[in-house]
Design a protein with these regions (language model features):
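Hydrophobic alpha-helical transmembrane segments
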Residues: 9, 16-17, 38-42, 60-68, ...
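Transmembrane helix-bundle core of multi-pass membrane transporters
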Residues: 88-156, 178
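Single transmembrane alpha-helix segments in multi-pass membrane proteins
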Residues: 1-55, 79-86
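Generic alpha-helical transmembrane segments of integral inner-membrane proteins
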Residues: 21-22, 42, 46, 64-76, ...
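Alpha-helical transmembrane segments within multi-pass membrane transporters and channels
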Residues: 55-96
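Residues that define the loop-to-transmembrane-helix transition and helix capping
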Residues: 35, 60-61, 87-90, 157-160, ...
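Interfacial loop-to-helix junctions that mark the boundaries of transmembrane helices
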Residues: 3-11, 55-61, 125-139
Length: 178
């Protein structure tokens, strides 16, 4: 393997690492989220038209909308699980297929061309080239995200509560952890 190949693999896996850490938090609490990939796809499809050069939309708007949409769907999943007492597997399974179907209906067989240069930099921009090993923006962002999540899970009360709740919810409740 050459340094360029390794950096390319890390760059492409960076998006999956973020999704994986988000899924880790869900699994720590004893749950499961099957819809995470489909929600990511639907978010991308819905905001794709705003990311083309001709749209003249500030990059922060689609990014904010993707985060807002993901949080809204996560809230719906959470309400189905906690208020309607639907098992997490079934609730997120249903959401997965609704999101997948909506993305397919919305995009059809279309493709977005001419992505905005700002978003292209955030998605693929090279910051440093160390003898063929390219450090790109996604690598830096995922490294920052991993450090923040490590700190949150390992060094904060919230992180300890997540671990305790997932390992034994009854014992966690008796210990005063909601």
């Amino acid at each position: 393997l050459k340094p360029g190949n390794i950096s390319n693999i890390i760059n492409q896996a960076s998006f999956l690492a973020i999704i994986g850490v988000a899924q880790l938090v869900v699994i720590l609490t004893g749950g499961i989220n099957l819809s995470i990939g489909s929600i990511m796809a639907l978010s991308t499809v819905l905001c794709g038209p705003m990311l083309v050069r001709e749209a003249n939309v500030p990059v922060i708007l689609p990014v904010f909308l993707v985060i807002l949409f993901g949080a809204a769907v996560g809230t719906v999943n959470g309400l189905m699980i906690t208020r309607l007492n639907i098992p997490a597997f079934l609730a997120t399974f249903a959401t997965m297929y609704v999101a997948r179907g909506a993305a397919w209906l919305y995009i059809g067989k279309g493709v977005f061309y001419g992505i905005n240069d700002q978003i292209r930099f955030w998605a693929m921009g090279e910051l440093v080239n160390l003898n063929g090993f390219r450090i790109t923006m996604p690598i830096v962002l995922v490294a920052l995200f991993l450090v923040v999540m490590w700190f949150l899970l390992a060094k904060t009360t919230l992180g300890r509560r997540l671990y305790f709740t997932g390992s034994n919810p009854v014992a966690a409740e008796f210990s005063g952890i909601p």
